[in-house]
Structure formats: structure tokens, C-alpha cells
């Protein structure tokens, strides 16, 4: 008898950090981001990727999902997502860095990806955690006066940068 080992490609984990602070309410930024996230969740489901979802709003970041397979249950969360409160994005990035490190030890073959959705409206930051995985920062800042901090944040996170308007026009 011959036994054949199943060859499986390593699982993918998509870590999504969503800035849902009050400033993302302006100019329909969060609404458009929700449409983009709905598409992302559908793609994750089709590709059988695992998702980790961290929301940065209020005073502390909150984990919604940690490493589960994408499912239709995320649609309920997405529909209820609203903007408000402060911007604990830096705390969310810190938590994400710690969580990814632990996860990497537990699942060394897993391919991790990072997506940060933010308007970048932070007062200041220093010493961002090294997340050590490919990343994309989607800038949802809109309006006549743009601070442009999301691009700087992407550079410091060693992530690619894309403005949401460029993605919507595709």
C-alpha cells in the first residue's frame, strides 16, 4: 500500500485593523470603507483565508474575530459598524504586533497579511511595532483639508499605501 500525504498550501491569515473613530464619519469615508471590507470578507471566504479583525474606536481597541475562517457572520458586524469616540489605533497596532508574534510561533507556516483602514488622523506617534508581514494601508481621509498622515504611517509600518478613492475607481 502506498500512502500519499496530502499536500496543502499553508493557510493565510488576514489581519484587518479598522479605524472607526469619529473622524472617519466625515465625507462618507467609513461608509465606503465598509463596502470595501464587505468585498474583502467575500474574497477571504472564497480563498478560505482566516481573518482576525480588530476595531479601533472609543477608548480601547476591540477584537471582533481572532483567526477564524471568514463567514457570513461578519456581515452582521459590518452592518452594525459605526464611527465614534477616540482613535486607539496605536494601541490596536501594538496589540496586533503582540498577537501576530504569538500566532507566528503557533503556526509558523501560516502566511500573514495586514490591512489597516484609517484616515491617519493621529496627533503623533513614535516607535510603532514591527508587524513583520506584508501590509497595505488604505487611507480613507477625505475632504478639502487633508493632513496626509496615513501615508507617513504606512511608511513607518513598512506597508504599501493606497487611497480608497483610487481603489473605488478601479
Locate predicted features.
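Von Willebrand factor
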Residues: 61, 69-112, 121, 139-148
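Acidic, polar low-complexity linker/tail segments
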Residues: 1-15, 23-29, 46-47
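Structural motif
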Residues: 13-15, 111-115
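C-terminal "exit" segments of structured domains
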Residues: 168-170
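VWA/integrin I-like adhesion module and closely mimicked acidic/polar interface patches used
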Residues: 120-165
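An active-site-proximal "capping" alpha-helix that borders the catalytic cofactor pocket
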Residues: 31-54
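Short beta-strand/turn micro-motifs composed of small residues
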Residues: 18, 55-57, 116-118, 139-141
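Short acidic, Gly/Ser-rich segments with clustered Asp/Glu that frequently serve as metal-coordination loops
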Residues: 20-31, 121-125
